[in-house]
């Protein structure tokens, strides 16, 4: 068993629902107990969809367990088929459904529907949501596009001269972080290169559309967590190459443009020359100088975490002090990326471990998921969301892609917004006793005024307490107890006072560095001198 | 559930009305959802669900953005090795509980909450609770109940939780009759009721659940209890086992319901009619006046309830009798005829009641009837709005102070607001 406070991913059948709900004319019959219909509101409320997800649940209850739950499943499937008349159906079980072993796949086959019925086996006690989405999409593609596969050994026909190249966009699903606008942005970008989009899947595709996947020249994989398994299969069976670059960030988008242009046999340079994005100029303008080496912690799904680290480091000039993911399937990629920034990757789905890491590293900005917002709020650190899981505010009404050149503009604004603006930062360092703009106050452009008086204490103590976070809710807003530093060195009162003169958002880091310095140099009492010795020692 | 048989046999005449029973896809929450409000009500309790990732995901989704600090609930997620019997589930549970209590030493009461998976593999949580209680006594008391979807629908999770607490409530020693109010109420509502009972001279009033585990009410043969919520049959039965007597009453929704509810207590405690009128009259008049504002908006409007919380019948009674709304269909996940007898007497004779659900068929009936307002869960609300229907999402009724005189107009406003909004929006 694993103790879980927050979970980064839902169970795998939620991944299957994301595929089914993203698609049209596909129905999902799910063998699940009463109550599992909660998943509907992920789509109707968080994503604000205006239709019920195309999912029929058997919703069995205790009294059904003594009877024939298999018959219950069959009647649910029969009714769903008659009522919704889908082009294809997927069938499977939720975690409890799988324990009662009714074999939805076999049962559905025996009903003799005249449409493809695809069983989706999801090991609910081993795998999670993204794996479920990937597996479902892969099984669908295999079952529906498979019959159109060319005989083994045949080569792909050359495209007729003068005919525009065609590609599929693979990976976007329902409940994906900014998938809606990423599709628009990438479709536009491909259009400027003279490349047509054949099928976007799963989002917006019907099963009939999936039969046409083989007609494209290559595949664009936007979200490897969902689509890389299907894309690999399409490459093997239909000889379609697929893209490896994820177009999040300016450099990555440029690389992506060159990669697709190569696959399509077109010249990318005119398009790149004409492309406009404001991020590079905004980031070069002197107003952004104070962003240099801001210490940032990044966590999310592997795709967004890796892309964000690159933007943070190369395009905004931050210093990446931590990088991690909950996508274990892509742990190797994240480890490789982390090595580039000289940090050790944090591969975990344990929220408490992430929290401890953030507390230990003392970043000035956290880029993460909805869960990291919880952590950052508790520790008083600015935060922006870069990856699912996200809540309703990250399914915005406005156009808000992460991908392509407009995505880079959105990212610049989103990530810089939570940071205190330059002038205010300077003034706070100069004048500590202002009654209004005081130490630890929230940036005044965020409008909410002042942080609770105890915020500095909470953030600082967190260094010493990575394992024992404050307890009951109320405790978070009470002054945290002053716990002795986990070192041999003791702070002299003047040094403690001097420490308070260091700006709030870097103070925790300064405290930790000073203590480390004292320990390494055998200093028993930390004085003002020790503080400045350490500052000189660690000067960047 | 055995409460069903008990309810039917005892049915008095007014409640023998025709009820449609439906069985099919239920679009409802499971009992785990009760944790979302119970963890705030009993402030030093922690709710540990023993279940799957789905259970953890459910509570997290239901709690939504509400909780940004560390919540007082969590899930022990069962893994492959727990199911395969490779590890002893009881040892694992002990390890997790030890870890949890070390992390949060302020916990006084720990509920092990059963789920569908733990139920299907027959993990005996009541024995685990006994074992852990002995180990952590006296600092922490460990109890267990089931919030699984197999056994409970939404608010029935509160029933299961409270029923698990009843056997450990202290025995009352006095000989004088005392009043126990049963069911989670908002703090402000509790305080209002305390003032009213005081005015009536019913001094010894306790509330269950209490605000923390240190102030558990006592119970015994001298205890008379009033249900404040309609979804508590198991809790009531446990209280009756301890000798307490239930006072039959409608539920305290609206002026009429609140008056009937208070009167049941007044009669049981021999409060004379003149005093009752003197104490309740000002509040009744004030509530009636506040309701007037909404009568014009709501009167004659046709109302359709999908099943959700078991509050549907008392709500339908209030909306039809005090605001002249018309009832198209009143769905309830489960109908306890005995506890709802006073409500059923008041409900219009022609109201169509449905117990259980087949959501597709119910949606067909709803579309056919085109009601003015549909009360339903969040999975249905936006899709129905998109079809041009006005909806009121039902869960809010569980999270808002709606009981008592001074909340009657707030309750009416919850139903008026979506209609006003639809009328206001031009685009």
UniProtKB/Swiss-Prot annotation, chain B:
Record's keyword annotation contains 4Fe-4S: yes
One Pfam family in the UniProt entry: Oxidored_nitro
The keyword RNA-binding is assigned to this record: no
Listed GO biological process terms: light-independent bacteriochlorophyll biosynthetic process; photosynthesis, dark reaction
Binding note for cofactor: Binds 1 [4Fe-4S] cluster per heterodimer. The cluster is bound at the heterodimer interface by residues from both subunits.
Key words of the record: 4Fe-4S, ATP-binding, Bacteriochlorophyll biosynthesis, Chlorophyll biosynthesis, Iron, Iron-sulfur, Metal-binding, Nucleotide-binding, Oxidoreductase, Photosynthesis
Coiled-coil positions: none
Cofactor(s) the protein requires to work: [4Fe-4S] cluster
GO molecular function: 4 iron, 4 sulfur cluster binding; ATP binding; metal ion binding; oxidoreductase activity, acting on iron-sulfur proteins as donors; oxidoreductase activity, acting on the CH-CH group of donors, iron-sulfur protein as acceptor
Binding site for [4Fe-4S] cluster: 30, 55, 116
Enzyme class (EC, first level): oxidoreductase
Disulfide bonds, paired cysteine numbers: none
EC number(s) given by UniProt: 1.3.7.7
Catalytic activity from the UniProt record: chlorophyllide a + oxidized 2[4Fe-4S]-[ferredoxin] + 2 ADP + 2 phosphate = protochlorophyllide a + reduced 2[4Fe-4S]-[ferredoxin] + 2 ATP + 2 H2O
Cited HAMAP family: ChlN_BchN
Function (record text): Component of the dark-operative protochlorophyllide reductase (DPOR) that uses Mg-ATP and reduced ferredoxin to reduce ring D of protochlorophyllide (Pchlide) to form chlorophyllide a (Chlide). This reaction is light-independent. The NB-protein (BchN-BchB) is the catalytic component of the complex.
Quaternary structure, from the entry: Protochlorophyllide reductase is composed of three subunits; BchL, BchN and BchB. Forms a heterotetramer of two BchB and two BchN subunits.
Family listed: Belongs to the BchN/ChlN family.
Name of the protein described by the UniProt record: Light-independent protochlorophyllide reductase subunit N
Organism of derivation: Rhodopseudomonas palustris (strain BisA53)
């Amino acid at each position: 068993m694993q103790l879980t406070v927050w979970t980064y991913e839902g169970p795998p059948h939620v991944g299957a629902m994301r595929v089914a709900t993203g698609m049209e004319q596909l129905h999902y019959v799910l063998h699940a107990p009463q109550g599992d219909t909660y998943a509907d509101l992920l789509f109707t409320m968080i994503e604000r969809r205006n239709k019920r997800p195309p999912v029929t649940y058997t919703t069995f209850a205790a009294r059904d367990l003594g009877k024939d739950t298999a018959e219950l499943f069959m009647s649910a499937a029969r009714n769903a088929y008659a009522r919704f008349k889908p082009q294809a159906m997927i069938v499977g079980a939720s975690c409890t459904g799988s324990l009662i072993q009714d074999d939805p796949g076999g049962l559905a086959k025996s009903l003799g529907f005249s449409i493809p019925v695809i069983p989706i086996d999801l090991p609910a006690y081993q795998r999670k949501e993204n794996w479920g989405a990937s597996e479902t999409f892969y099984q669908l593609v295999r079952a529906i596009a498979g019959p159109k596969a060319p005989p083994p050994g045949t080569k792909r026909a050359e495209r007729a001269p003068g005919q525009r190249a065609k590609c599929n966009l693979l990976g976007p699903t329902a409940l994906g972080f900014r998938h809606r606008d990423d599709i628009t942005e990438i479709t536009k970008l491909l259009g400027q290169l003279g490349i047509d989009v054949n099928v976007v899947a799963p989002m917006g595709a019907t099963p009939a559309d999936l039969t046409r996947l083989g007609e494209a020249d290559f595949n664009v994989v936007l979200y490897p967590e969902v689509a890389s398994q299907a894309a690999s299969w399409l490459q093997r069976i239909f000889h379609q190459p697929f893209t490896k670059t994820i177009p999040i960030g300016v450099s990555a988008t440029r690389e992506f443009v060159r990669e697709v242009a190569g696959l399509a046999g077109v010249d990318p340079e005119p398009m790149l020359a004409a492309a406009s994005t404001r991020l590079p100029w905004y980031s070069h303008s002197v107003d952004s100088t104070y962003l240099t080496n801001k210490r940032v912690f990044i966590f999310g799904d592997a795709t967004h975490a890796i892309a964000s680290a690159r933007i943070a480091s190369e395009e905004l000039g931050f210093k990446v002090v931590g990088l991690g993911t909950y996508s274990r399937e892509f742990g190797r990629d994240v480890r490789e990326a982390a090595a580039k920034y000289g940090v050790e990757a944090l591969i975990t789905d344990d929220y408490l471990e992430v929290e401890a890491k953030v507390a230990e590293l003392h970043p000035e900005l956290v880029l993460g998921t909805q869960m990291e917002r919880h952590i950052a709020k508790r520790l008083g650190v600015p935060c922006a969301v870069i990856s699912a899981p996200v809540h309703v505010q990250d399914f915005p009404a406005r156009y808000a892609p992460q991908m392509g050149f407009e995505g880079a503009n959105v990212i610049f604004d989103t990530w810089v917004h939570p940071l205190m603006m330059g002038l205010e930062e300077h003034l706070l360092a100069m004048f500590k006793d202002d009654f209004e703009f005081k130490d630890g106050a929230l940036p005044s452009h965020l409008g909410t005024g002042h942080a609770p008086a105890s915020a500095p204490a909470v953030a600082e103590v967190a260094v010493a307490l990575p394992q024992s976070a404050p307890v009951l809710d109320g405790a978070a807003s009470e002054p945290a107890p002053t716990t002795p530093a986990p070192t041999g060195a003791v702070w002299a009162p003047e040094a403690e006072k001097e420490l308070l003169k260091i700006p709030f958002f870097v103070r925790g880091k300064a405290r930790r560095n000073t203590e480390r310095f004292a320990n390494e140099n055998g200093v028993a009492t930390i004085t003002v001198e020790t503080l400045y010795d350490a500052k000189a020692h660690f000067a960047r | 559930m055995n409460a069903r048989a008990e309810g039917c046999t005892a049915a008095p005449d007014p409640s023998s009305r025709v009820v449609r029973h439906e069985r099919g896809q239920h679009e409802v929450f499971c009992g785990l959802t009760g944790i979302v409000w119970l963890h705030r009500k009993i402030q030093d309790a922690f709710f540990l669900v023993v279940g799957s990732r789905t259970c953890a995901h459910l509570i997290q989704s239901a709690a939504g953005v509400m909780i940004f600090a560390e919540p007082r609930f969590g899930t022990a997620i069962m893994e492959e090795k727990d199911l395969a019997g490779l590890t002893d589930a009881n040892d694992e549970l002990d390890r997790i509980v030890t870890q949890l209590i070390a992390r949060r030493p302020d916990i006084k009461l720990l509920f092990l909450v059963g789920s569908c998976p733990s139920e299907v593999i027959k993990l005996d949580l009541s024995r685990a609770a006994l074992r852990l209680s002995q180990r952590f006594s006296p600092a922490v008391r460990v109890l267990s109940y089931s919030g699984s979807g197999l056994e409970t629908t939404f608010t029935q999770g509160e029933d299961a939780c409270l029923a698990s607490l009843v056997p450990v409530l202290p025995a009352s020693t006095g000989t004088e009759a005392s009043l126990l109010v049963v069911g989670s109420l908002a703090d402000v509502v509790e305080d209002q009721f305390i003032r009213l009972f005081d005015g009536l001279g019913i001094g010894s009033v306790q509330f269950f659940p209490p605000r923390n585990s240190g102030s558990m009410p006592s119970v015994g043969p001298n205890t008379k209890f009033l249900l404040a919520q309609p979804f508590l049959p198991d809790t009531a039965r446990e209280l009756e086992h301890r000798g307490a007597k239930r006072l039959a009453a409608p539920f305290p929704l609206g002026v009429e319901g609140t008056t009937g509810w208070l009167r049941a207590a007044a009669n049981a405690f021999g409060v004379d009619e003149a005093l009752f009128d003197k104490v309740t009259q000002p509040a009744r008049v004030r509530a009636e006046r506040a309701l007037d504002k909404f009568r014009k908006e709501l009167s004659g409007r046709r109302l359709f309830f999908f099943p959700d919380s078991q509050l549907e019948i008392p709500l339908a009674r209030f909306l039809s009798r005090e605001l002249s709304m018309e009832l198209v269909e009143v769905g309830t996940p489960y109908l306890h005829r005995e506890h709802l007898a006073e409500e059923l007497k008041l409900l219009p004779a022609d109201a169509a009641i449905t117990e259980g659900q087949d959501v597709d068929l119910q949606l067909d009936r709803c579309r056919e009837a085109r009601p003015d307002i549909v009360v339903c869960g969040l999975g249905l609300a936006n899709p129905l709005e998109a079809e041009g229907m006005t909806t009121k999402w039902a869960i809010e009724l569980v999270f808002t102070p709606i009981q008592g005189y001074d909340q009657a107009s707030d309750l009416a406003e919850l139903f008026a607001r979506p209609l006003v909004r639809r009328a206001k929006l031009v685009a």
